[in-house]
Amino acid sequence: MSNRVIIFDTTLRDGEQALAASLSVKEKLQIAMALERLGVDVMEVGFPVSSPGDFESVQTIARTIKNSRVCALSRALEKDIDAAAQALSVAEQFRIHTFISTSTIHVESKLKRSFEQVLEMAVGAVKYARRFTDDVEFSCEDAGRTPIDNLCRMVEAAIHAGARTINIPDTVGYTVPSEFGGIIQTLFNRVPNIDQAIISVHCHDDLGMSVANSITAVQHGARQIECTMNGIGERAGNCSLEEIAMILATRKNLLGVETGINAKEIHRTSNLVSQLCNMPIQSNKAIVGANAFTHSSGIHQDGMLKAQNTYEIMTPESIGLNRNNLNMTSRSGRHVIKHRMEEMGYSEQDYNLDALYEQFLHLADKKGQVFDYDLEALAFMEAQAAEDNFYQLQQLVVQSDSTEGVATATVRIDVGGEIKTEAATGNGPVDAAYNAIARATDRRIDIISYKLGAKGEGQNALGQVDITAVYHEQNFHGVGLATDVVEASARALVHVMNLTCRADKVADYKQNMHKNRELGGV
């Protein structure tokens, strides 16, 4: 049996299902390119039949990615497989991933079919997918709750039909490691053609067992792990890619397997996914959390000074996190900024150097010293602003009356190329800014959640505002970054405004599509 574990990343498919707002095609491509640099073997990038937008993003990524195999999901239906094959046809190497439910509760309650009918559908889907590619993966949805006899029959039939990879998902995160390991071992013991396919696992974290179950599966013969960056995904999330990669690397002496992951790209990729997906990383998150390599105890600090491995089983440098920061001030030249971005693993195609340097000088004049996290925030904020936004905040001026508690805000906003200036009052500066923006955009939304955080520490921190707003009975999540909390709040609101504008365009597209179908008699 091979000692190489295939890393199958599904951040852009399963991971995206957890997001408050869908990623744009440009954002998905940026993440896909980061995953390629990270060294994932396979990246599942969407469900093409689900929407024109998903089809476009899968096709765009398939056309761009060269070093990783691009995969798309499909149900065990010919129309799904056709859409996946069409979207992937431009790729240098691709995989079609088809699935069907196999547990009794899913077969009877969701599919309302017999197991024999489901078995026939699975075989038909695999055979049909093989018309387009030799690389077909088949998943037994809810395998963790599937009767073992049925699971063995399904796996054997799918392999016989031509599936090269068989995925065993713990779809609802129900199993514990000893149980899940037993399922994998039973498949190896009882399925006669098991050696003709790679066994994969896809574990969810509903009971916090996803990583442990995946590692146990590897110990019992699985050689592909499906995972996401930062563990994002449906409900409680998926198996965390960075945790799996570092467990297999750090405990190679015990587990005896390896991956092709370039661990030095982990920190950079984690931050990119967090920023673009608007999902902050908890401080105590293993591997990539802010406290993962922080030592507060005096005893621990003393031990670290004497020998680093007294309290660290891996180094921050191993995941691409540099311990030493270069002091950057307004006197730093453009080459210093470029050098620091390169040291953090970014290439010039990831950001606009001219725009970043201009923003850097502005921030350095305000803060004095600028840190690595400031540069990353500025780079992503610039990328966000350039994303074909209909609304762009150009200026914000706020005046507050401390005695009356009333504030006045004046905003200048580019609204689709037309500059509008509006003023409004409110109960505090943030409320006033929001009222002025609403007046300038003539777009009404209801804010249901407002969270204020910080990028960095102490007085040098950047303010980060995360808001959730309701528009046409749908929730939208926006984020804003600035040295000033009011400006960060305004940027978060404008971010949401642009998301709702994009949603309106999608709604119009869907309406026209339905009209065309009705006219065509489809």
Curated annotation (Swiss-Prot):
The keyword Amino-acid biosynthesis applies. Pfam families: HCS_D2, HMGL-like, LeuA_dimer. InterPro entries: 2-IPM_HCS-like, 2-isopropylmalate_synth_dimer, AIPM/Hcit_synth_CS, Aldolase_TIM, LeuA/HCS_post-cat, LeuA_allosteric_dom_sf, LeuA_bact_synth, PYR_CT. Residues 5-267 form the Pyruvate carboxyltransferase domain. One of its GO terms (cellular component) is cytosol. Keywords: Amino-acid biosynthesis, Branched-chain amino acid biosynthesis, Cytoplasm, Leucine biosynthesis, Manganese, Metal-binding, Transferase. SMART domains: LeuA_dimer (SM00917). Pathway: Amino-acid biosynthesis; L-leucine biosynthesis; L-leucine from 3-methyl-2-oxobutanoate: step 1/4. It catalyses: 3-methyl-2-oxobutanoate + acetyl-CoA + H2O = (2S)-2-isopropylmalate + CoA + H(+). The keyword Transferase applies. It is found in: Cytoplasm. Residues 392-522 are annotated as: Regulatory domain. Its EC number is 2.3.3.13. PANTHER family: 2-ISOPROPYLMALATE SYNTHASE 1, CHLOROPLASTIC-RELATED, HOMOCITRATE SYNTHASE-RELATED. Belongs to the alpha-IPM synthase/homocitrate synthase family. LeuA type 1 subfamily. NCBIfam families: leuA_bact, PRK00915.1-1, PRK00915.1-3. HAMAP family: LeuA_type1. This is 2-isopropylmalate synthase. It comes from Shewanella sp. (strain MR-4).
